[in-house]
Amino acid sequence: MILAVQAVENWNEKPSWYDEVRKFADASSSAFLTFNTLDDSSYGDHRLLKLGSCWGGWKGNGQNPSYHSPGSYKLMRDFQASFPAGMRTYTLPFSDMTTEWNRLIATSNGVLNHFQCPLVPNWGRVTVDGNDNIVGDSGSFSGSGTPQYEFGSEASRTIWRVAFDAAMYPSEMDSFSKPYLSGIISQLDNGYAPDAGVNLKFFEGDTVSLRFSCSMVLDSMDLLSLSRRVLTSRS
């Protein structure tokens, strides 16, 4: 919705849906930050993504790396920062929305960094150490019928989430998305293949998906960058 609004915001004659959609996008962003994230002071200054409004969180409540989308949070943050306050028919849930979005972005980056080696699992658990750094929490967690430690149908989405961040915010990619994706791309460039031993079972069903997803990262970044240029140049 935000991209659709941005695509036409400079048009002299805007579509009939323009105001309705941008108000809905703003309200949806506020609802997401309110109901789909956790702010628990016992885990330091982190705002953690949940797996929906009713599950997911710290420790045994579980995490899924592919749910984290820092680029989407930046998009919502910036959209809300520029949204006309007079058009809102509700009270914002936080006095400083930008700060709360930035906390969520930083926490998601920390979660993604923890899980990467450089691939990520379908599911996992996280907590914080004595210095409030995000670390792993031992134990099992899974959902959707996919194994916890497999780079499978859940985990493969993580690449696209991070690539979206790099494409939408290229000036910020050096701090997170570029080094994150570089490890994955480097493995493929070096002809990485899983050992044909005990770990093969975790790759057999997803080899095509794995190689396709990773090898297409650069192409997807180019495509999204082009889309961004088109959106910002429309008048």
Residue spans for each PLM region:
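Extended ligand-binding clefts on enzyme/binding-domain cores
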Residues: 15-232
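Long, hydrophobic/aromatic-enriched structural stretches that serve as scaffold segments
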Residues: 1-17
